[in-house]
């Protein structure tokens, strides 16, 4: 009996040592989750500035705070993290844009409003988790995103293909709430403001909407 107990004790120690040796470092492992997990909602307010293909060669002021090219905006987004590093987000933003070539005068704001919305599907990369490993108690996260979608001018009743990209930084202020700042660009086909453009190359006929945004993220579970 004593020999049997000794053999069982030795086997137990050996198995424990083996399990300890093969335990992976979960900090950098890739883990997926159920469909109901890790959803989030975001609401934000932004300042956006428009740079169109039609203004090329007219020497207009480039400041993003000029009245003829900038306006405030709002946004709403819903998304899900599929792994700690990769997620998807559907983002709707607008409402007040500008048609920069309205009268070629950078001293007036009259007549160049362009109400719009942009709907994008974006892939999000959590760079903090990607390069430093996942930590549940991390306060600050840095992310990047890129995507595509569609924009619509409600003023001119036109649609335009849209590409988007940017950086996103968030700070956890409660268990399920974070404050974020985001800087990004939406680059539209030229007909987002009902203009034809002046360049031969299609990439030069695009209207670019740069924005800086602040908002809140609510984690749903």
Which residues does each PLM region occupy?
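Outer-membrane beta-barrel biogenesis signature
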Residues: 18-42, 127-142, 220-221
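Short glycine/proline- and aromatic-enriched beta-strand/turn motifs that initiate or cap beta-hairpins
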Residues: 20-77
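Residues that define the transmembrane beta-barrel architecture of outer-membrane proteins
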Residues: 37, 68-74, 113-119, 140, ...
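Residues on the lipid-exposed face of transmembrane beta-strands in outer-membrane beta-barrel proteins
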Residues: 43-45, 76-80, 121-127, 146-150, ...
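Predominantly the C-terminal beta-signal and adjacent terminal strand-loop region
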Residues: 97-103, 174-221
């Amino acid at each position: 009996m004593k020999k049997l107990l000794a053999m069982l004790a030795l086997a137990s120690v050996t198995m424990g040592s083996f399990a300890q040796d093969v335990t992976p470092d979960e900090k950098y492992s890739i883990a997926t989750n159920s469909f109901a997990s890790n959803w989030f909602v975001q609401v934000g307010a932004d300042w956006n500035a428009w740079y169109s293909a039609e203004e090329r060669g007219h020497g207009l002021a480039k400041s993003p705070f000029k009245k003829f090219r900038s306006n405030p905006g709002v946004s709403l987004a819903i998304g899900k993290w599929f792994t700690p590093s990769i997620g998807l987000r559907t983002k709707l933003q607008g409402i007040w844009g500008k048609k920069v070539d309205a009268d070629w005068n950078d001293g007036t704001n009259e007549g160049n409003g362009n109400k719009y919305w942009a709907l994008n599907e974006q892939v999000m990369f959590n760079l903090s988790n990607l390069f430093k490993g996942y930590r549940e108690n991390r306060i600050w996260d840095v992310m990047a995103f890129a995507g595509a979608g569609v924009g619509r001018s409600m003023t001119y009743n036109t649609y335009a293909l849209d590409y988007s990209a940017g950086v996103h930084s968030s700070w956890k202020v409660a268990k399920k709430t974070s404050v974020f700042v985001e800087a990004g660009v939406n680059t539209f086909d030229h007909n987002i403001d009902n203009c034809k453009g002046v360049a031969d190359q299609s990439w030069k006929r695009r209207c670019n909407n740069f924005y800086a945004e602040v908002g809140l993220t609510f984690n749903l579970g």
